[in-house]
Design a protein with these regions (language model features):
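Interdomain "pre-motor" coupling segment immediately N-terminal to P-loop NTPase/helicase cores
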Residues: 1-46
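Charged, amphipathic alpha-helical linker segments immediately N-terminal to NTP-binding catalytic cores
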Residues: 29-79
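Short glycine-rich substrate-engagement loop in P-loop NTPases that contacts/grips substrate
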Residues: 61-78, 91-97, 113-152, 165-168
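Phosphate-binding P-loop
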Residues: 82-91
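Walker A/P-loop nucleotide-binding motif
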Residues: 90-108
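Structural motif
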Residues: 155-157, 189
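Walker B catalytic acidic pair
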Residues: 160-161
Length: 235
């Protein structure tokens, strides 16, 4: 049977330019995803206005850098602020790393909040959800829908990389996503609890090499903030 293709024009279907979804339509889809995932409610509380340095010690120092935990956090905060401020004028990627609960996810939420407020398309995934989406996209009939968001959003945030079940598919898809977004000059933020020296073993040398040469490494240090909040009565 001869397969027919119908290209919908802008006049035929609102939200489309030719056969492609227009920016406003993509943003509406992303807005719906945020509403369904409850992330919009989270971002009301987790943004730059609510970032606190009180959870970071101003006496504990990193011997290698000579910085206290609080100074390290302030440096990360300033980098995140600069990332948002210069987002439209420069291409940059961030790699947030450090132990569990030191504020990596909170900081990425701060960035997501401000860029969404300025009408940018931001896709935010836990590593598990991202690779599940890519697997569904790869093995479903509509192979491009998931990748469209992953490759084309203004900013892609991959949270908690290393907590997913890692296999050859995950490793190859991570490299593909990172490389494709670099080629398209689309910014990406990755957060992970993995130590840098273990990253290549978990994924691959070429993936870490691509990250090391194209991402700004941002470390956060300190005690688990979630545990601190429990002792402080949730404050």
């Amino acid at each position: 049977m001869h397969r027919q293709y119908h290209f919908v024009s802008d006049a035929e279907a609102p939200g489309y330019v030719g056969s492609q979804k227009c920016t406003c339509f993509k943003k509406a889809e992303i807005e719906l995803l945020y509403t369904q995932s409850n992330l919009k409610e989270i971002l009301k509380k987790e943004n730059f206005d609510h970032f606190s340095f009180d959870y970071y010690s101003d006496t504990m120092k990193n011997e290698a850098t000579g910085l206290t935990e609080r100074e390290t956090a302030r440096r990360a905060y300033d980098i995140a602020r600069g990332f948002v401020r210069n987002f439209d004028s420069s291409f940059e990627n961030l790699f947030l790393y450090g132990d569990t609960g030191v504020g990596k996810t909170f900081l990425s939420h701060c960035i997501a909040h401000d860029l969404l407020e300025s009408a940018h398309c931001v896709m935010y995934f836990s590593a598990f959800d991202l690779f599940e989406l890519l697997a569904d996209s790869k093995f479903s009939r509509d192979k491009t829908e998931g990748q469209e968001f992953v490759f084309d959003s203004d900013l892609l945030i991959i949270d908690d990389l290393g907590t997913e079940l890692t296999n050859s598919f995950v490793s190859s898809q991570l490299f593909l996503g990172i490389n494709e977004r670099i080629m398209r000059r689309k910014s990406t933020i990755i957060s992970t609890n993995l130590k840098l020296e273990n990253f290549s073993d978990t994924y691959s040398e070429r993936t870490f090499s691509r990250i090391a040469s194209n991402y700004r490494m941002v470390k956060l240090e300190g005690k688990d903030i979630r545990i601190q909040k429990i002792f402080l009565g949730g404050k």
